[in-house]
A protein has these predicted regions:
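Divalent metal-dependent phosphate-bond-processing catalytic cores, especially two-metal-ion Mg2+/Mn2+ enzymes
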Residues: 4-11, 16, 87, 128-177
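Alpha-helical scaffolds flanking conserved acidic
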Residues: 23-28, 72-90, 131-138
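Active-site flanking loop/helix segments enriched in acidic
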Residues: 26-52
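Alpha-helical phosphate/pyrophosphate-handling elements in metalloenzyme active cores
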Residues: 42-81
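Membrane-helix exit/interface motif
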Residues: 68, 94-99, 121
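Active-site-flanking alpha-helical
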Residues: 91, 95-96, 147
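Post-HEXXH active-site segment of zinc metalloproteases
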Residues: 98-113
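Post-HExxH zinc-binding segment in Zn-dependent metallohydrolases
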Residues: 109-128
Length: 177
C-alpha cells in the first residue's frame, strides 16, 4: 500500500501522463484559494472557495458522524459523500463564483455550471448520487448562512447579506422538512 502511494506521488512529481488528471485536481485545489466568495460584493471577511470547501467537507463529516446510527450507508457510500463534498465547487474554479440570483437570471450559466460539474465528477469517478448531493447541499447552505451571518456580525450594512441570511435560513429549514 505505502509503495503504491509513493509510486503515485513520484509520478505526480514527474508529471507522468498516467496521472495527468490528478495533477489537474491538485492544481485546481490550489486555485480554489484565489476564487473569492460572494463575487464582486463588498465583504468585510475575505472568504475564498477553499475555505468554504473545507467548512462544507467538515460539516458533511459531522452530519455523517451524527447520523451514523440512523443511516444505513456502507463505507463506500460514506466515502462517496465525503469526496463529493471535497469537489462540489470545482466548477467555480473554472467559471468563478456565480451567485444564485445571477444563475436564475441567466439559466444558460446554470446549465453550463451543472454540465461542468457532471464532467468533473466523471473525471473523478464520483457517483453523482442524490444522497451525496442532498447532504452536501445542506452543508453548503449552512455554510452560506454562516458566511452571511459573519458579514452581518462584522458590521456589513449591505442589505443583500440580510436578504441572503433570511433566504438561506428559509431554504435550510425547507430542506430539513
Amino acid at each position: 500500500m505505502l509503495t503504491n502511494v509513493l509510486n503515485i506521488a513520484n509520478k505526480l512529481i514527474q508529471n507522468n501522463p498516467e496521472v495527468y488528471n490528478y495533477n489537474l485536481i491538485i492544481e485546481n485545489t490550489q486555485n480554489q484559494m484565489t476564487v473569492e466568495r460572494w463575487a464582486k460584493r463588498l465583504s468585510l471577511n475575505d472568504f475564498n472557495l477553499l475555505e468554504h470547501t473545507a467548512r462544507v467537507t467538515a460539516l458533511v463529516d459531522i452530519f455523517l458522524q451524527i447520523k451514523k446510527t440512523e443511516n444505513n450507508f456502507d463505507k463506500s457510500m460514506e466515502l462517496n459523500v465525503f469526496r463529493y463534498s471535497l469537489y462540489h465547487d470545482y466548477p467555480e474554479v473554472i467559471l468563478n463564483d456565480m451567485p444564485s440570483p445571477v444563475k436564475q437570471d441567466y439559466p444558460i450559466l446554470d446549465k453550463i455550471q451543472k454540465n461542468t460539474e457532471k464532467e468533473i465528477m466523471n473525471i473523478l469517478e464520483l457517483t453523482n448520487s442524490k444522497t451525496a448531493k442532498f447532504i452536501c447541499k445542506i452543508a453548503d447552505i449552512y455554510d452560506c448562512l454562516y458566511e452571511s451571518k459573519a458579514e452581518i456580525l462584522a458590521g456589513n450594512k449591505d442589505p443583500e447579506y440580510i436578504k441572503n441570511r433570511d433566504s438561506y435560513e428559509n431554504t435550510y429549514h425547507k430542506q430539513l422538512n
